[in-house]
Amino acid sequence: MQGRRDRKNRGNIIRKYLLTSILLLFITTGVNAQIEQPRRVLEIGIAGGLNLNKMDFQPTIRQKLLNGANGGVSLRYTSEKYFSMICAAQLEVNFAQRGWEEDFDDGTGNSYSRTLNYIEIPLLAHLSWGKEERGVQFFINGGPQFGFCIGDSEEYKGSWKPEERPTSIRPVYGKEIYNTFDYGIVGGLGVELKTKAGNFFIEGRYYYGLSDIFNNSKTDDFGRSANQTISVRLGYSIRIL
């Protein structure tokens, strides 16, 4: 009798263990499925818009925002979904106009601006929330950006002469661009509408340059001369994989 009771108890324990193990397996599988859901989506896109530019100068130069254009192509690969967050990597190649416009406060109507033309390569993490197929997604982008200055132009208006300007900022007029390679950090947020005909989006970005366009040694005229840009972009993308 005692032996049968022991075997019965062991059987009950084994059944409880198996049931518990199966339950834990289902729970773990369900949690993992909710936490990490693989995706394999490749999209190409185009975008363009407006840049509002200024330069971070030391010593300071009084400025207005200089308008410029931006436009380019993108490649986005979506790899997985964590909870409700869709994770992707995005590579872009863009043309962008940067630079600055000096703010003359002497009431004469004189002006000076300098436009810098760049080919830019942002390497972005793209995180989004919302509908994956049909509907609205909200997203953020962020990462490093590299650029190459391919040309620049200056525009003088009015009767003033560079030698009449304050001594601290006079060297900027006609000064050659020393560093054509630019790098910095870019971040943005936007809304994307996913439709059967493709995806339409609008995005705002801010770029903070970490490199200087002029030499910045102790004997040079400027200790800092870095790009800063606010961008507004409209775009369209389609899935190719």
Residues covered by each model-derived region:
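Short loop/turn motifs that connect adjacent beta-strands in outer-membrane beta-barrel proteins
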Residues: 34-41, 80-87, 130-137, 194-199, ...
